[in-house]
């Protein structure tokens, strides 16, 4: 009788109090799981019960209901600056430097001139938690590859783009594509969503695995720039969104960008891992995307040797 292994998205438990403290046994255990997941699939689900409690989850997505009901889609509306809509039914607000409380406050004031402390404080807290996870995960990877001495400089050059995303109820369940198959042009991406499924992850064997979220979880995904930095050790996470439920799908995402030049550390080069990428400026890379084929892994098309 033959058996078939069903691919699953790896889960890393960050519930222990010292799991984000470098050098502890919990840290070292999580580091092993994180690196294995990023090398094999390019992503993992992080469980964060103490940092993302159910009441926080409920608060942020209740606020989304109000936020996305504001009439922003008019040509003369100043709110359009951070608003994107698409024919696939995806609507997005974006905040540059989204971990800066001042930026969140200014964004909040555009919609609620008299203030909305609950939304602002909850969005700030989510951004803070996600940035903390991003710093910890990248530090784990740097440590694992023996280049931890570069991590502080790397993190100082990191800034974040915060996105608030709504997928409308699909016209045809299981057929409508909310987001086509792609890899992110980031160093890393972290998403937290409501209960409505739709995010699917592509495996090395070209299977599509559905991400089944928990209220206390986020999904960490490696982007193209992480792949370049690691000289192909880390797999960029190819993913898509297929709308299969008769409900609105909300997602809250933090995307890490790098100010300056990305290059492969010398320590990651050996006879089995020759240099595969030229140094490149991340922001220039983003500006060049309109000239690259959407079917390619963008980093390989842009700076592969």
Feature annotation, model-predicted:
Residues 1-305:
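Peripheral, non-catalytic segments flanking oxidoreductase cores
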């Amino acid at each position: 009788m033959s058996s078939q292994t069903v691919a699953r998205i790896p889960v890393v438990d960050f519930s222990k109090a010292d799991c984000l403290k470098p050098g502890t046994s919990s840290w070292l255990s999580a580091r092993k799981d994180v690196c294995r997941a990023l090398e094999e699939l390019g992503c993992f689900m992080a469980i964060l019960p103490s940092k993302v409690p159910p009441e926080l989850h409920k608060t942020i997505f209740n606020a989304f209901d109000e936020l996305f009901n504001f009439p922003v889609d008019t040509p003369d509306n100043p709110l359009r600056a951070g608003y994107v809509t698409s024919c696939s039914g995806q609507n997005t607000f974006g905040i540059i430097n989204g971990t800066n409380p001042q930026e969140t406050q200014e964004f909040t004031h555009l919609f609620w001139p008299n203030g909305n402390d609950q939304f602002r404080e909850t969005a700030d807290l989510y951004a803070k938690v996600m940035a903390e996870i991003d710093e910890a995960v990248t530090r784990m990877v740097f440590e694992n590859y023996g280049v931890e001495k570069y991590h502080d400089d790397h993190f100082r050059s990191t800034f974040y783009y915060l996105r608030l995303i709504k997928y409308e109820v699909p016209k045809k369940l299981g057929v409508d594509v909310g987001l086509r198959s792609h890899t992110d042009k980031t160093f890393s991406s972290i998403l937290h969503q409501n209960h409505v499924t739709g995010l699917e992850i592509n495996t090395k064997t070209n299977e599509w695995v559905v991400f089944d979220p928990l209220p206390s979880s986020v999904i960490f995904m490696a982007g193209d720039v992480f792949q370049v930095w690691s000289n192909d050790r880390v797999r960029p996470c190819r993913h898509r969104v297929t709308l299969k439920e008769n409900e609105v799908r909300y997602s809250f995402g933090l995307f890490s960008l790098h100010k300056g030049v990305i290059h492969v550390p010398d320590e990651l080069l050996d006879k089995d891992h020759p240099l595969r990428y030229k140094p490149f400026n991340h922001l220039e890379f983003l500006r060049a995307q309109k000239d690259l084929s959407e079917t390619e892994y963008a980093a390989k098309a842009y700076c592969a040797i």
